[in-house]
From Swiss-Prot:
PpiC domain boundaries: 172-273, 283-381
Free-text note regarding domains: The PPIase activity resides only in the second parvulin domain. The N-terminal region and the C-terminal tail are necessary and sufficient for the chaperone activity of SurA. The PPIase activity is dispensable for SurA to function as a chaperone. The N-terminal region and the C-terminal tail are also required for porin recognition.
Classification via PANTHER family: CHAPERONE SURA (PTHR47637:SF1)
Subcellular locations according to the entry: Periplasm
Bilayer-crossing regions: none
Function: Chaperone involved in the correct folding and assembly of outer membrane proteins. Recognizes specific patterns of aromatic residues and the orientation of their side chains, which are found more frequently in integral outer membrane proteins. May act in both early periplasmic and late outer membrane-associated steps of protein maturation.
Protein name (record): Chaperone SurA
Source domain of life: Bacteria
Lineage: Bacteria, Pseudomonadati, Pseudomonadota, Betaproteobacteria, Neisseriales
Keyword field: Chaperone, Isomerase, Periplasm, Repeat, Rotamase, Signal
Family matches, as HAMAP family: Chaperone_SurA
Coiled coil: none
Signal peptide as annotated in the record: 1-19
GO molecular function, one term: peptide binding
Gene source species: Chromobacterium violaceum (strain ATCC 12472 / DSM 30191 / JCM 1249 / CCUG 213 / NBRC 12614 / NCIMB 9131 / NCTC 9757 / MK)
Length: 429
């Protein structure tokens, strides 16, 4: 099936499906969930279900029964809503400039002008305003993840050393995995745990009966990748817990694990493929300078933005970036003219990296908002670097941090969901 533009946009930018415009399925709308003081309607749910079906079909995955998918998508929408409400309560706001840049990037990636993007979206029944709203939602959740979770994740030298030792014993094998997660709430009682255990074993029975893993994942999994067939992509041995690597070493390609109980809930994993990872580890590195104006109780968002605009104006009129960094930057790199040295992807927060990689060498960015404040960025160089020897430890640390970030974020979202007031009315007619 030929993918729509929307599916391409999802694949290139979003981690979850972009919502299509609400298309009434019934003449009378109704509330299907209450999340604190907000509601999710039947028509909103149906629009997201329709988009989920398109996404699955684009992956050549047969969707589960619609009523099953409705329940899965509704839970996704509830989880999104509690995060968006939390962000709003903390004053987290995505500026229009960030949305403008994301739209421009989408058009560029698909080799379209803005007018061409509008026209192509219209063919898929999507307005540009709706796309912008979806992008704003995804950027909000992404920034929330960084501000609430990233600062709490640490990786010790001993963890890195142990991972490298394990990788050597595993001959640097890489694994392509898929997963099904039946999440267990933090304060679940024995009855809830038993019900969830029955759910995951029903999923296991469907797999044993020959149902495709991707279809079972879409029907049962609570993980964000459920509607992507549970696909986790390629994972190196260093990015996985040692006990799990030992299990994978004994499995054949195509096999599923038994049900595995973890702190998050019940997992079933599929070993889709595996390969030797002994080739050189080439990473793209960037050499940026930056100027940071922080926001805090004494400096408002508007004041910080005005200050960074003034600094940029001086640079555009001929002032040297390094001199301005020494004078105005509120980062520890100011003494070095804002020089951050050579950095790898994953070293910096996503908003900074996204702006950095799009900049031509020698060009000063527009102001960039991150959880730390407002930045100006100047890229002085970029290169591909082999990190398989001297810099392997750095790469391993990044992999471990990414895994711990994923788990910490999942745990944090679960706690946020459990603490919210949620009423579901999907079964009410």
């Amino acid at each position: 099936m030929k993918k729509t533009l929307l599916a391409l946009l999802i694949a290139s930018v979003m981690q979850s499906a972009l919502a299509a415009p609400a298309t009434p399925v019934r003449e009378v709308d109704r509330i299907v969930a209450v999340v604190n003081k907000n509601v999710i309607t039947w028509q909103e749910l149906q629009a997201r279900v329709n988009e989920a079906i398109k996404q699955l079909e684009a992956q050549k995955v047969a969707p589960p029964p619609r009523e099953v998918l409705e329940r899965q998508v509704l839970e996704q929408m509830i989880t999104e809503e509690v995060q968006l409400q939390y962000a709003a309560s903390g004053g987290l706001r995505i500026e229009d400039a960030a949305v403008d840049q994301a739209v421009a990037n989408l058009a560029k990636q698909n080799k379209l002008s803005e007018a061409g993007l509008k026209a192509q979206l219209a063919k898929d029944g999507i307005t540009l305003d709706r796309l912008r709203a979806d992008i704003r939602r995804e950027l909000t959740i992404s920034r929330l993840r960084d501000s609430e979770v990233a600062s709490r994740v640490n990786v010790s030298d001993s963890e890195v050393d142990q991972a490298m030792k394990s990788a050597q014993s595993a001959n640097r094998t890489e694994y392509h995995l898929a997963s099904i997660l039946v999440a267990v709430p933090e304060r679940a009682d024995a009855k809830q745990i038993d019900q969830l255990s029955q759910k995951v074993h029903k999923a296991q029975a469907d797999l044993a009966a020959g149902q495709p893993f991707a279809k079972v994942s879409a029907a049962y999994s609570d993980a964000p990748n459920a509607l992507k067939g549970g696909d986790m992509g390629w994972r190196s041995a260093t990015s996985l817990p040692q006990e799990f690597v030992q299990l994978l070493e004994q499995m054949k390609v195509g096999a599923d694990t038994d049900v595995i109980r973890t702190q998050q809930g019940f997992f079933i994993f599929k070993l889709v493929d595996k390969r030797s990872g002994g080739a050189p580890m080439m990473v793209e590195q960037y050499h940026p300078r930056h100027i940071l104006i922080r926001t805090n109780e004494a400096v408002s968002e508007a004041d910080a933005k005005a200050r960074i605009d003034q600094v940029r104006d001086r640079i555009m009129r001929g002032a040297k970036f390094a001199d301005m960094a020494k004078l105005y930057s509120e980062d520890g790199s100011n003494a070095k003219g804002g020089d951050l040295g050579w950095v790898n992807m994953g070293d910096l927060v996503p908003e900074f990296e996204k702006a950095m990689v799009s900049l031509p060498i020698g060009q000063v960015s527009q102001p960039v908002r991150t959880p730390f404040g407002w930045h100006l960025i100047l890229v002085e160089g970029k290169r591909n670097q082999d990190v398989s020897s001297d810099h392997e430890k750095m790469a391993v640390k990044q992999q471990i941090r990414a895994r711990k970030m994923e788990q910490a974020y999942t745990d944090w979202v679960r706690q946020l969901r459990d603490s919210a007031f949620v009423e579901e009315h999907l079964d009410e007619k």
